[in-house]
Amino acid sequence: MHGILRVKLSEEQRKLKAEKERAKIEEYRGLVSRFQEARKRKDYSEGNLKLTTELLDWNPETYSVWNYRREILLNDVFPKISLNEKQDLLDNELKYVLSKMKVFPKVYWIFNHRRWCLENAPYPNWNYEMMITEKLLSADARNFHGWHYRRYVVSQIERAGNCSLAKKEMEYTTSAIATNFSNFSALHNRTKLIETILNLEADPNSQKALAKQILEQELDMIHQAVFTDPDDSSVWIYHRWLMGHCNPNSMTPLISMITIEERIQYLQKEIELIQELHEMEPENRWCCESLVNYEALCKTLEKQKPTEADIKRWTLLVDKMIKVDPQRRGRYRTLQEKINNLNK
């Protein structure tokens, strides 16, 4: 690895190292064999919890061991203890899981087991779990597992309190994006929150006004992002999600009460802005692709067929995309086929 000095080992040192590794492999294989035999026998005795701990200390990504651990708790441990004892046991289990999360913050099976513990705990502490998500995302703001887990925790708090945290969570994603625009997980979370916030508004007129306000705020934020870093794919994907709502068949809360004429105006404004960026960044494939897609969508909304000049301009943009991004040539050729079919 870079920055690490390689030390040349003598023959004797190599043999000693190989012997140690061989011993570790044999130990691990022995544990796996014991686990497989015990589970095959459906041996759910509490003593096998230690076996699962040893295996998970070796490799926390072994989902079948996590499953067996839960089977032991459900079949042998829980039936024998009181609610308070069960809570104490699961508190210790959560501490164990947290120790794994700190070292392996992106292993699905660890998060899955934590959720199971909380769902089986008599008195789950969701506020503490929210603090855990903040620490996870503070360490890595783009950790998809951390964002997914946060959505889960928020849903549990909302259900317990019969309330909505959507607006607060929107503020949280805004802070995360302000720190780093290139945060696809935060932007993805935003797509879910926007529709939730709009659905909270019961009055149709108020919902329409709020939809326009949110759309314009989101576009302003994205404009700043694309001009700051035009090659950031996460920002363009989010922009496409926003503008995709202008599709004539879109009935999502964000755009459903905005007229076709207003959708056309939004598209035209975005096209002008992207053309301006394209002049500064002529090799940017995101600009090229967005111009083709949005101009074609605009024609559809206007119920007009593209002119020969339109087709020629879009074809030149597709050719540019293939040139600057040849690895995705198949995708761009499919786009070209769609362009060719627009006049048929």
Swiss-Prot record:
EC numbers on record: 2.5.1.60
Top-rank taxon: Eukaryota
PFTA repeats, residue ranges: 44-78, 89-123, 125-159, 165-199, 214-248, 266-293
SUPFAM superfamilies listed in its UniProt record: Protein prenylyltransferase (SSF48439)
Biological process, per Gene Ontology: endoplasmic reticulum to Golgi vesicle-mediated transport; protein geranylgeranylation; protein localization to plasma membrane
Enzyme superclass (EC): transferase
A molecular-function term among this protein's GO annotations: small GTPase binding
Catalysed reactions, as listed in the record: geranylgeranyl diphosphate + L-cysteinyl-[protein] = S-geranylgeranyl-L-cysteinyl-[protein] + diphosphate
Membrane spanning residue stretches: none
Keyword vocabulary terms for this entry: Prenyltransferase, Repeat, Transferase
GO CC annotations, alphabetized: cell division site; cytoplasm; cytosol; mitotic spindle pole body; nucleus; Rab-protein geranylgeranyltransferase complex
Assembly notes: Heterodimer of an alpha and a beta subunit.
Family, as annotated: Belongs to the protein prenyltransferase subunit alpha family.
Role summary: Catalyzes the transfer of a geranyl-geranyl moiety from geranyl-geranyl pyrophosphate to proteins having the C-terminal-XCC or -XCXC, where both cysteines may become modified.
The protein, known as: Geranylgeranyl transferase type-2 subunit alpha
Origin species: Schizosaccharomyces pombe (strain 972 / ATCC 24843) (Fission yeast)
Highest classification ranks of the organism: Eukaryota, Fungi, Dikarya, Ascomycota, Taphrinomycotina
Gene that produces this protein: bet4
